[in-house]
């Protein structure tokens, strides 16, 4: 396919138009008085959102060169979302400001490589200063503040803070769509996996259709049990103890299942069989997790063990097990804290090494199940459109809160970027490098300016006053007052601010050093095939 090529100024100007189109659509959502953007969906109702990355991903421009510019800024939002989970609009605003200011200087004759050096130096200094001024997050109220600012909803802030308090910082918090209008929190304590009883005859509570085992023994194996003789020795030992038994196996079938059910119904012993969770290597890892949590052993041929040789010492123990048609929950496993901590450390190490998003999610789930539990926030709303928008906001708030726990918090509302302004301005540099630093200084003002504009105020007036205020004092756009941001609970996670700045600078530097842009030439529309009449008809036809 033939290509269109543009060079230097012409290339950068075309891409800048795309950058501005996308950034202008995204930046109206910034701050407490930011507006929403409506996105058309081919199926179903339109999506109304104020989430920067969601808007950025939807934008496709007709002109190929403009579209490349837009996609570069969408990449800033996307990367910030991947790293910090929030701050995508701030990242977009910063990128637009750096690209716009940088392009002015390149047009005036500045060397793009010198500008790049200055931009990188300024951002490195700003990031170091952000680390210095960040405060560790403490207590439930701080977590609630971070979440409430991100979601623009205090109720959501309280909900997320409660969820994190109940499942711990390593716990998994997931979002589900509620069937009602209200948003609620549901916490599953202990380890839960998505496998239910092998037979409904094993239930102990017919009203709730669940089996509840108190202080049970737990047999853990990756083998299929089809012959009762295999587990008879260990079964007899459990019956002598007068305790219930939970069997976790690849499958329990045929004669073995029938014998267990008959004896359960006769009241000889209380037993529930469930299939092992997961598949392949993940199944082995999850069975090992259950064994460590319950101080049992995985009976597997890989370790030279068979079911006949299993003794009561090989079995795990737990305070309580609840088995429903779909799930099994093990509460109060008796495993030693040291072993559980060691296993958690092992999973954390794997988390750092993995590059697969799917593996990361599964490892995070395993970590949560060992560390504390799983919280589910059930999001409710009056309409489907509102539900989608609310779910996106809560997702952002959740990511924001996790980022705050990791790297601490800084003053919100763009104030922290202005707080590092003086430090960046003091960097010794000259020539194009100094110009690069000035580009970053101008960009640092932009989030505050945009928040003020979205609140219906003159942005430059707010920026100039902020430069003269003490560190930590900022403009509360929601009330129009000047307050101490940290004390007022207007905070941003340091990780979100840092990621937004670094990603914006990275793309801006690449943009300014671009000298040629190559795009596919649009295909000419081929003429439609003429009709038969135009051909004078076919011979022999009337």
Swiss-Prot record:
Chief location bin: cytoplasm
Binding of ATP, residues: 29-32, 86-90, 413, 476-478, 492
Location of the protein in the cell: Cytoplasm
GO biological process, one term: protein refolding
EC number: 5.6.1.7
Enzyme class: isomerase
Matching InterPro entries: Chaperonin_Cpn60_CS, Cpn60/GroEL, Cpn60/GroEL/TCP-1, GroEL-like_apical_dom_sf, GROEL-like_equatorial_sf, TCP-1-like_intermed_sf
GO molecular function, a single term: isomerase activity
Record's keyword terms, sorted: ATP-binding, Chaperone, Cytoplasm, Isomerase, Nucleotide-binding
Transmembrane segments: none
Gene3D superfamilies per the UniProt record, alphabetical: GroEL (3.50.7.10), GroEL-like equatorial domain (1.10.560.10), TCP-1-like chaperonin intermediate domain (3.30.260.10)
GO cellular component: cytoplasm
Catalytic activity: ATP + H2O + a folded polypeptide = ADP + phosphate + an unfolded polypeptide
Membership in a protein family: Belongs to the chaperonin (HSP60) family.
Quaternary context: Forms a cylinder of 14 subunits composed of two heptameric rings stacked back-to-back. Interacts with the co-chaperonin GroES.
Function as written in the Swiss-Prot or TrEMBL entry: Together with its co-chaperonin GroES, plays an essential role in assisting protein folding. The GroEL-GroES system forms a nano-cage that allows encapsulation of the non-native substrate proteins and provides a physical environment optimized to promote and accelerate protein folding.
UniProt name for this protein: Chaperonin GroEL
Provenance organism: Bacillus cytotoxicus (strain DSM 22905 / CIP 110041 / 391-98 / NVH 391-98)
């Amino acid at each position: 396919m033939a290509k269109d090529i543009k060079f230097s100024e012409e290339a950068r100007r075309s891409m800048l138009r795309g950058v501005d189109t996308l950034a202008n659509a995204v930046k109206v959502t910034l701050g407490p008085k930011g507006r929403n953007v409506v996105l058309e969906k081919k199926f179903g109702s339109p999506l109304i959102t104020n989430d920067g990355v969601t808007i950025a991903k939807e934008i496709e421009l007709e002109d190929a060169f403009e579209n490349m510019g837009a996609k570069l800024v969408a990449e800033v939002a996307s990367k910030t979302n991947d790293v910090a989970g929030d701050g995508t609009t701030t990242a977009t605003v910063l990128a637009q400001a750096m690209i716009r200011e940088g392009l002015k200087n390149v047009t005036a004759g500045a060397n793009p490589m010198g500008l790049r050096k200055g931009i990188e130096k300024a951002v490195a200094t700003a990031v170091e200063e952000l680390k210095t001024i960040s405060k560790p997050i403490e207590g439930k109220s701080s977590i609630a503040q971070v979440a409430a600012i991100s979601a623009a909803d205090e109720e959501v802030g309280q909900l997320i803070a409660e969820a994190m308090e109940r499942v711990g910082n390593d716990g998994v918090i997931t979002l589900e769509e509620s069937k009602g209008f209200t948003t609620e929190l549901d916490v599953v304590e202990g380890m839960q996996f998505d496998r239910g009883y092998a037979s409904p005859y094993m239930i102990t509570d017919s009203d709730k259709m669940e089996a509840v085992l108190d202080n049970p023994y737990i047999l853990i194996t990756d083998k299929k049990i089809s012959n009762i003789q295999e587990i008879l020795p260990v079964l007899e030992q459990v019956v002598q103890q007068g305790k219930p038994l939970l069997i976790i196996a690849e499958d329990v079938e045929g004669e073995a299942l029938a014998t267990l059910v008959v004896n359960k119904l006769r009241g000889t012993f209380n037993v529930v069989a469930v299939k092992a969770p997961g598949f392949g290597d993940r199944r082995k890892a999850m069975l090992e997790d259950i064994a460590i949590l319950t101080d049992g052993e995985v009976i597997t041929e890989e370790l030279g063990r068979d079911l006949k040789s299993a003794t009561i010492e090989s079995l795990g123990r737990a305070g309580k097990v609840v088995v429903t048609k779909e799930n099994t929950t093990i509460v109060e496993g008796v495993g030693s804290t040291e072993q559980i901590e060691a296993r958690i450390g092992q999973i954390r190490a794997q988390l750092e090494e993995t590059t697969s998003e799917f593996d990361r999610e599964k490892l995070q789930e395993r970590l949560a199940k060992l560390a504390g539990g799983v919280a589910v926030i059930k999001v409710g709303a009056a309409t489907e459109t509102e539900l989608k928008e609310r779910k996106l906001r809560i997702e952002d708030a959740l990511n924001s809160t996790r980022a705050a726990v990791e790297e601490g918090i800084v003053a919100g509302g763009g104030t922290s970027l202005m707080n590092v302004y003086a430090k960046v301005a003091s960097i010794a540099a000259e020539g194009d490098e100094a110009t690069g630093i000035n580009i970053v200084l101008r960009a640092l003002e932009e989030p505050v300016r945009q928040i003020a504009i979205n609140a219906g105020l003159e942005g430059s007036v707010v920026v100039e006053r902020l430069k003269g205020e003490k560190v930590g004092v900022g403009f509360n756009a929601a009330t129009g007052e000047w307050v101490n941001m940290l004390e007022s609970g207007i905070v941003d996670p340091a990780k979100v601010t840092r990621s937004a700045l670094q990603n914006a600078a990275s793309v801006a530097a690449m943009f300014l050093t671009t000298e040629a842009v190559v795009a596919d030439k649009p295909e000419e529309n081929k003429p439609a095939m003429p009709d038969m009449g135009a051909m004078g008809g076919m011979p022999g036809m009337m």
